[in-house]
UniProtKB/Swiss-Prot annotation:
The keyword RNA-binding does not apply. The gene is MT-CO1. This is Cytochrome c oxidase subunit 1. O2 binds at residue 244. The chain crosses the membrane at residues 12-40, 51-86, 95-117, 141-170, 183-212, 228-261, 270-286, 299-327, 336-357, 371-400, 407-433, 447-478. One of its GO terms (cellular component) is mitochondrial inner membrane. One of its GO terms (molecular function) is cytochrome-c oxidase activity. The keyword Plastid does not apply. Binds 2 heme A groups non-covalently per subunit. Binds a copper B center. It comes from Cratogeomys neglectus (Queretaro pocket gopher). Fe(II)-heme a binds at residues 61, 378. One of its GO terms (biological process) is electron transport coupled proton transport.
Amino acid sequence: MFINRWLFSTNHKDIGTLYMIFGAWAGMVGTGLSILIRAELGQPGSLLGDDQIYNVVVTAHAFVMIFFMVMPIMIGGFGNWLVPLMIGAPDMAFPRMNNMSFWLLPPSFLLLLSSSMVEAGAGTGWTVYPPLAGNLAHAGASVDLTIFSLHLAGVSSILGAINFITTIINMKPPAITQYQTPLFVWSVMITAILLLLSLPVLAAGITMLLTDRNLNTTFFDPAGGGDPILYQHLFWFFGHPEVYILILPGFGMISHIVTYYSGKKEPFGYMGMVWAMMSIGFLGFIVWAHHMFTVGMDVDTRAYFTSATMIIAIPTGVKVFSWLATLHGGNIKWSPAMLWALGFIFLFTIGGLTGIVLSNSSLDIVLHDTYYVVAHFHYVLSMGAVFAIMGGFVHWFPLFTGYTLNDTWAKIHFTIMFVGVNMTFFPQHFLGLAGMPRRYSDYPDAYTTWNTISSMGSFISLTAVILMVFIIWEALASKRVVKSIPLTSTNLEWMHGCPPPFHTFEEPAFIKSSNK
């Protein structure tokens, strides 16, 4: 029965599919919002006519892409589908809680969308800083609805994190240690730990903001002995681990894709990859104030946060060079998934380099809140996280559906997307260096050229998104059934065929220990 299967599901594959579909739909909404932003900035003068509505669109774009596209697809979609299969578990540890984690997201999304329908909407930026997010600058229910939306999304992620940690630690076959699990499983576990430790801090911060707005507390109001900078510390203590939460599962997927299409049976430097992810996870918690170099911190504090931020480049570099070493000497298959992975490595590295530039507190004081920052994090998100999602999707699509994509269309899609995102975000480095500030709906004529090129690029990306919908339709309509998958001995998730049966590993898997 349809309702029993899809509403009350306790099956990790079905819930993973729900996450995928929800994330894809939210991704369309987020893309639409980004097109509105680039349409407004395509030429000087005003299109939407109102700075408040522009900022509402920018804020919604960020929230939708982060909480309803990247996280549901990477952690909820790929995580649910692949983690139990990769460790030989029959399902997740808490299957009903898994269902609840998913069904908290649509109401959360509804609250976010409704926040833009009441009063003037929440035009605060995704950081929701007071006093702009206070009840004076944002009277009405908009920001409150946004806060409740974040609460629900946060509870969803925390429950999911508990579920993944328990599953990965507890549900492996007795014979295998944690250091024999695939890198994607490691990446999801580390991501889950980051979620578990960082989200409660965000919840605390936005709950205090909620009481400041509605119950006359003064946590962030100097008039009552509060401090708006406290909010920034609480937010970024969550916000920085969050950006690693968005990219770590991508690291795991890229490791699998690069290994597979290089014809290797294991990635280069497995232990180094694991330790690099653990280091990134740990360091992600002790660098948060690099988002706050302009609030007037002591020089020694700035020196610490600059150095600590630069240290993160080391484990990240370990990962990049290990991917390149995995490619080395391989029998490389230029499949669409491999193209996405290679694009990821190249563009993520560029994003990482601009991150090193921004980690210098003195430089950041000039570049903070300019388009240089926008360019930086879109290189690691729009070309890091999204490329990893696309690579993972085209790689595992036969596993999820049992059908094959059209290779030629998939490669064309990659090419259009690659051109589009680079044309959109590369010029923004120049805008930032020339001093164009973020979160403004208009700009002096001097910035016209690069903005126009950037907006053209965004429409090319939109074309790629629409083409992707066609490619998925084409695959599901043509029904080219998967015949056989090579290398299943080192890729456990493919062992049960494509697609795998509804229940897998109902009896505990017997793992023969090969290294003894």
